[in-house]
């Protein structure tokens, strides 16, 4: 029997929709995984590592080459310095890093702020840690979304100890502006809050956005000592199944994350760690090409959905577009997404899956993933024509 605090999270809609798509042959634009491989050089390093016997437990913090490559990437791209020995920890994906950060650094009973809508692992992780989730909704901003910094300030109470900040943001595609990040930093310092940043889409900020470049919160004054920066290879190098992530932060923060992580999975992905180290050191050009390709795919899907009558919100980063099907006569996105695979042969995710159970504010929006081959996207667009 599942314990009460996890009963609301027993089954994820992503697993349900992916299974349904596979069962009936629907094009899966629901779950955010690509259907093309990462850079060939990286794959070759992994293959060689397996052949050469790199198949046993790696060091607990991750192999030195990967920790060094992570630190070098953060310095090269963001001018943020980390000691690879004491300030970098390799994890089994970013999801484990988030879980270990909350479990290892936030006392039970504490409030953790999250921006709504939010990635689906945040709530169960907060529940597993015995903490209390407190949501701060994003607000409409023209064709996109923005942070209501006054609402964030108002949400901080005497029991608030941490916040999870995700930018580029899944599921909306929003990228927090410099001004929004600065306001978050000022609040965190003033209220003495721990900040866990989920930056897995850091490489996928599109060139036509107002911001153009991902900016880590750890760069802001007073934030280095209170920020756990989390990212992964999954979205950067098209290897979601490798589950190689990392956490970076001050030594005392990483010690807490490691204390929890070592009893969750201990280690993982031995032959993939040298491959990701290689990619971080050598595949910046490949990542830029990936970003440009995804920007084109975003534009193709956005134009098609708009032509069909959806109201499509701007996506400044990530794999995702948010669309409003109300102009087509659908006012409940949960019902729309339940019917769509059967009616059109396409799977998508209702925005309600990323929200508090009692909040219907977002239930008019649908998330579509565009991280697919061009022929897959074209087939999805062709099938969606039935909605006209």
Give the ranges of each region predicted by the language model.
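Active-site phosphate-binding strand-loop segment of PLP-dependent enzymes
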Residues: 138-211
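Conserved core segment of the aminotransferase class I/II
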Residues: 224-295, 302, 308, 388
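Conserved PLP-anchoring active-site segment centered on the Schiff-base-forming lysine
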Residues: 102-126
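N-terminal small-domain helix-loop-helix segment of the aminotransferase-like
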Residues: 2-93, 100, 151, 279-282
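Helix C-cap/helix->beta junction micro-motif
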Residues: 24, 129, 190-191, 308, ...
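A short helix->loop->beta-strand "cap" motif at the edges of active sites that frequently abuts
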Residues: 110, 131, 190-193, 223-225
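Conserved glycine-rich beta-strand-loop-beta hairpin in the small C-terminal domain of fold type I
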Residues: 277, 294-302, 312-325
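PLP-dependent enzyme catalytic core of the Aspartate aminotransferase-like
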Residues: 153-154, 339-348, 354-388
């Amino acid at each position: 029997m599942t314990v009460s605090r996890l009963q609301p999270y027993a089954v994820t809609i992503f697993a349900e929709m992916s299974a349904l798509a596979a069962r009936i042959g629907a094009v899966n634009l629901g779950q955010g995984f690509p259907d093309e491989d990462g850079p060939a050089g990286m794959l070759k390093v992994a293959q060689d590592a397996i052949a050469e016997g790199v198949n046993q437990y790696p060091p607990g913090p991750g192999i030195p080459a990967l920790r060094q490559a992570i630190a070098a990437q953060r310095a090269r791209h963001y001018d943020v310095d980390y000691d690879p020995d004491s300030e970098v920890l390799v994890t089994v994906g970013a999801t484990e890093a988030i879980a270990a950060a909350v479990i290892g650094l936030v006392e039970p009973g504490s409030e953790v702020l999250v921006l709504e809508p939010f990635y689906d692992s945040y709530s169960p992780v907060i529940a597993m840690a015995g903490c209390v989730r407190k949501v701060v909704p994003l607000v409409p901003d023209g064709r996109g979304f923005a942070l209501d910094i006054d609402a964030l300030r108002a949400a901080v109470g005497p029991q608030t100890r941490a916040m999870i900040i995700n930018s580029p943001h899944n599921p909306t595609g929003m990228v927090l502006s410099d001004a929004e990040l600065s306001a978050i930093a000022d609040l965190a310092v003033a209220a003495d809050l721990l900040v866990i940043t989920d930056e897995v889409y850091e490489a996928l900020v599109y060139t036509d956005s107002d911001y153009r470049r991902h900016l880590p919160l750890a760069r802001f004054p007073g934030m280095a000592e209170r920020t756990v920066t989390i990212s992964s290879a999954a979205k950067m190098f098209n290897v979601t199944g490798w589950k190689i992530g990392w956490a970076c932060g001050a030594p005392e923060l990483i010690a807490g994350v490691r204390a929890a992580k070592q009893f969750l999975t201990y280690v993982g992905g031995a032959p993939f760690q040298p491959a990701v180290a290689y990619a971080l050191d050598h595949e910046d050009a490949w990542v830029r090409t990936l970003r440009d390709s995804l920007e084109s795919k975003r534009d193709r899907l956005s134009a098609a959905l708009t032509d069909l009558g959806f109201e499509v919100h701007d996506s400044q980063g990530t794999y995702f577009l948010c669309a409003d099907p109300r102009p087509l006569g659908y006012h409940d996105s949960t019902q729309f997404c339940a019917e769509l695979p059967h009616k059109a042969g396409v799977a998508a995710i209702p925005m309600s899956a990323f929200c508090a159970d009692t909040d219907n504010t977002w239930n008019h929006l649908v998330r579509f993933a565009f991280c697919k081959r061009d022929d897959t996207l074209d087939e999805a667009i062709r099938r969606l024509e039935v909605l006209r």
